[in-house]
C-alpha cells in the first residue's frame, strides 16, 4: 500500500510548477468579511504533459499546495512534433479564445504571459498564439488547455484512417497551399 504512494511521488517529482495567479477573495457575512485566496497553478514536464489546477484556502501557501496538487491530478498529454503542435486549433473558455498555430523551427514561443506558461510547460518550443476576447488569466489558461486537449496526434489519425503518417501530413500541406 505504501509503495503506491511512493511511486506517485516519484512520478510527480519530474514536473515543473508555475503559479499563474494569486487572487484575494472575500465573502461578506454577518460577522464581517472572510478573506481567502485563490491560486491558479500549472505543472508540466516539458515533454508533452501539462496540467492546470485551482486551489482555494485562507492562507496563500495552503492555496498554492492545493492548486499544485489539483494540477497534478488534471494532467493532459499534448502531441508535440518537432517542437511544435501538429495542427492549428482554437481553445475556448467562457469569453476567452486562444488561437494556437504550429510554427517553423526557430520561431520560438509567440504568446502572452498565461498562454506562454502553459505552452512552455507542455514542452512546445515553436508556436504562434493569439488571445482573443477576455484576458482573465484563469479563463485564458483553461482555453489554452482546452485547445491542447483538442489536438489530434497524427499517428492516431493515421491508424484510424488506415493510412501512413506522411499521407496525413500531405493532406494538411495541400489544404494550406490551396
Swiss-Prot record:
PANTHER family: MITOCHONDRIAL RIBOSOMAL PROTEIN S5. Part of the 30S ribosomal subunit. Contacts proteins S4 and S8. GO terms for molecular function: rRNA binding; structural constituent of ribosome. Disulfide bonds: none annotated. Residues 15-78 form the S5 DRBM domain. Keywords: Ribonucleoprotein, Ribosomal protein, RNA-binding, rRNA-binding. The keyword RNA-binding applies. HAMAP family: Ribosomal_uS5_B. The N-terminal domain interacts with the head of the 30S subunit; the C-terminal domain interacts with the body and contacts protein S4. The interaction surface between S4 and S5 is involved in control of translational fidelity. Belongs to the universal ribosomal protein uS5 family. GO terms for cellular component: cytosolic small ribosomal subunit. InterPro entries: Ribosomal_Su5_D2-typ_SF, Ribosomal_uS5, Ribosomal_uS5_bac-type, Ribosomal_uS5_C, Ribosomal_uS5_N, Ribosomal_uS5_N_CS, Ribsml_uS5_D2-typ_fold_subgr. With S4 and S12 plays an important role in translational accuracy. One of its GO terms (biological process) is translation. The keyword rRNA-binding applies. Pfam families: Ribosomal_S5, Ribosomal_S5_C. This is Small ribosomal subunit protein uS5.
